[in-house]
């Protein structure tokens, strides 16, 4: 697992992991570009260099419209619930990026449960070498030091629980079984 140090380092590391001798890649993203991260645009740029396609899904029509205008025809942005789209996908996934349900670090369970549902709907399409990234899933309390300076994060750091620490916590537990 990678600690969420910064977006540039994280994305660069992930793209190096999946850049191999492949003709085409298939990326699936839940939660399109939001809050300035521009992940969908990054995946689209990768696909335009190395070939393939991107499926991104979001419930917010405004986010979908803005994102669709910024990507190529190799990226399809769906305006629907990810739990409805994922069962319709029938090809192997090279890169899965789960980021559809904003996490409340004081109550991460609803987001974690949603991402576990997403993962379970698509895990049969993952193969050895597939990359799964779940945003906002700190691996250690030091993650909270990375620019998150506020009284609420100081409280979180004191009560940090690696078994319930963000969107991907339940997926992590599932993978450890």
Residue ranges and their predicted role:
Residues 1-177:
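A short alpha-helical cap/connector motif
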């Amino acid at each position: 697992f990678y600690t969420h140090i910064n977006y540039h380092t994280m994305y660069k590391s992930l793209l190096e992991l999946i850049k191999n001798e492949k003709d085409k890649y298939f990326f699936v993203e839940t939660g399109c570009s939001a809050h300035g991260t521009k992940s969908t645009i990054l995946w689209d740029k990768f696909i335009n260099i190395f070939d393939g396609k991107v499926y991104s899904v979001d419930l917010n029509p405004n986010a979908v419209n803005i994102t669709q205008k910024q990507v190529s025809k190799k990226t399809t942005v769906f305006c629907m619930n990810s739990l409805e789209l994922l069962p319709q996908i029938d090809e192997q996934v090279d890169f899965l990026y789960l980021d559809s349900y904003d996490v409340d670090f004081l109550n991460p369970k609803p987001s974690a449960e949603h991402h576990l549902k997403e993962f379970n709907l698509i895990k049969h399409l993952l193969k050895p070498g597939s990359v799964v990234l779940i945003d906002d899933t700190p691996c250690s309390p030091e993650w909270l030091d990375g620019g998150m300076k506020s009284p609420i994060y100081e409280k979180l750091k004191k009560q940090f629980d690696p078994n319930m620490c963000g969107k991907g916590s339940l997926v992590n537990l599932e993978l450890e079984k």
